Structures are given as structure tokens and as C-alpha cells.
Amino acid sequence: MQIALAPMEGLVDNILRDVLTRVGGIDWCVTEFIRVCDRLLPASSFDKLAPELRQGARTAAGVPMRVQLLGSDPVCLAENAALACELGAPVIDLNFGCPAKTVNKSRGGAVLLKEPELLHAIVREVRRAVPANIPVTSKMRLGFDSPDGALECATALAEGGSAHLVVHARTKVEGYKPPAHWEWVARVQDVVKVPVFANGEIWTVDDWRRCREVSGAEDIMLGRGLVSRPDLGLQIAAARDGRDYQPMSWHDLLPLLREFWRQAQAKLSPRYAPGRMKQWLAMLTRSYPEAVVLFAELRREDDCARISRLLGVEAQVLEACVA
């Protein structure tokens, strides 16, 4: 069984990848998508979104990182995939699942699920362009507005050369609205000969158990569930192995919050760092009552010094506040 950290544009950047993979329970992670239009990108474009390439394509914790590309031009994607490999990418992942309207309007992401022939052509050209030892993988949704074409799309990707598929079990139109249709993951597995990862609505160990039962998928990709519960991978791995596991407490999480904030201040401008901190903290409120208290304190705060104080001394007494 493999447990992967999902690529989430605007959320799971190199800072959050670093922090989440320190926790453990993640076998590999993926960059935010690198947008490919009509030209060969400069190396700096890859360095910006995938700085781990400078350290052997691994996070500081040693977790392998894969490079994800998004676009609709098979030849241009192939050229950029080859460059990514030259820069050290160990795997090329192709994005056919992004639901963002701005991305879809420019023929990127989930809108391409309307064109299974193009999906096949993209994967085929990328597969031809990169070294034989570099896997090419694909992430897809069930379709744009209906899952009716999901099996045709999955077949096109697999036959084009995808080493595995990650299936986000919702359509583009459904976005992130529950439920995830895990039964479609099972149907995809029935028609392709490559491994299939289940993705979508896995927030807890019980969700994982239900997903495995319905989808039949052994491998999973965790997105928002892991962001809101950083040790979810460890919890699932323990349940899989029949081991006892004590979930991460708020006290355990605080050092990670502070490390995230330290890196955010070092890598982002004072204008943007507070927003990134609040973005992650808001997602943590789903799993930690203490995060609700801290988020209420930080919600309207944009001063980095005051945020640092709240994450320091005051953060240490939050458990008492909610007890």
C-alpha cells in the first residue's frame, strides 16, 4: 500500500510539503502544477514551484517529490517534461483534474476530460520524450460534468503510457462537494491494467476503510484530509498494520505550526505570509478545537510580529482555553 500527499495548487506548496512530510506516513508527494502553455519554460519556473529539485527531489524529511505539469499541447508538455527530468524530476505527473475555472478556460486540467483522444496524445508524447526509467503518471477526475466518460478517459491515459492513475472520485462540476464516488474507482480498476489510487473525501481512518471496501483500491492519495489532520497517513498505516497508535495532539502539532510560520516568513513577503498561516490554520480547525481558538485570534491579524507572539507563548496555553 502506498499513501501519497496530493498536489493542491495554492495550498500544498514546498513549505507545507516540507512540514507535512516531517510527520511521517507519506510515501511520496507531488508539486503544485507547473503551467505549460506554448513554450519551453525556463529552469527558474521549475525551481520556483519545485525547489526540492535542488536537494535530490526530496523534502527535508527525505520523502520523494514528483513534478506535475498541466497543459493541453502534447509537444510542448513533452519538451517541458524532458527539461524537468534533466533538472532531476524522478517522476512526471500530468494534471487532468484541476477544477479551477481559470485553468479550465485556458484548456487545462479537468476540461480535457472532454477529449480522451487528446489525453492519450499528451501521455504518449510525454512518455516518448522522457527517459525510459522515468515513470509518467496521471491524475484525473471522473469527468467534467458527468462520469459517463470516466472509463474511456482512464483507458486513454493508461494506454498512452501512464504508469499509474490517481482518480479523484468526483467530476469537475462537483468540485469538492461530498460524496466522493468511490465505486467509480473500482470501475476504473476493472478496465485498466495499471495501479489506481483512490482520492477524495478520506478524512479519517474510518473513511479510508470505507473507501477501500467500496473502491477496492489499496493505494490512496490524501489531500485536504492530511492537511487538516497531519498524521492521518500514520493513523491509516497503523490501522492497516494492526498497530496501536496515539493520534497527534495539539501539543505535538505546535512545533510544526511554528516551523511552517518560520519558513513562511523566510520565503514569502510580509504581505503574503500571514495569509498562508491562516489558510492552514483554518483547515486545522476541522480536527483540532485548539485551532479554532487560535484562528479566532489570528483571523484579522496581519502583523507578523504579533502572529509570532501568538504562535509562541500564547499558543502554548490554548489547550487550557478549550479544556
Swiss-Prot record:
Give a short account of what the protein does.
Answer: Catalyzes the synthesis of 5,6-dihydrouridine (D), a modified base found in the D-loop of most tRNAs, via the reduction of the C5-C6 double bond in target uridines. Specifically modifies U16 in tRNAs.
Protein family (similarity comment):
Belongs to the Dus family. DusC subfamily.
Q: Kindly give the PANTHER family that the UniProt entry links to this protein.
A: TRNA-DIHYDROURIDINE SYNTHASE (PTHR11082), TRNA-DIHYDROURIDINE(16) SYNTHASE (PTHR11082:SF26)
Q: What class of enzyme is it?
A: oxidoreductase
Species source reads Pseudomonas putida (strain ATCC 47054 / DSM 6125 / CFBP 8728 / NCIMB 11950 / KT2440)
What InterPro entries does the record tag this protein with?
Aldolase_TIM (IPR013785), DUS-like_FMN-bd (IPR035587), DUS_fam (IPR001269), DusC (IPR032886), DusC_C (IPR042270), tRNA_hU_synthase_CS (IPR018517)
Q: Where along this sequence does the record place binding of FMN?
A: 7-9, 68, 139, 199-201, 223-224
Q: Print the keywords alphabetically.
A: Flavoprotein, FMN, NADP, Oxidoreductase, RNA-binding, tRNA processing, tRNA-binding
Q: What taxonomic lineage is listed for the species of origin?
A: Bacteria, Pseudomonadati, Pseudomonadota, Gammaproteobacteria, Pseudomonadales
Q: What cofactor(s) does the depicted protein rely on? A: FMN
State the active site: 98
Protein name as catalogued = tRNA-dihydrouridine(16) synthase
Q: Which Pfam families match?
A: Dus
- Site feature (Interacts with tRNA) residues: 35, 95, 176, 276, 278, 299
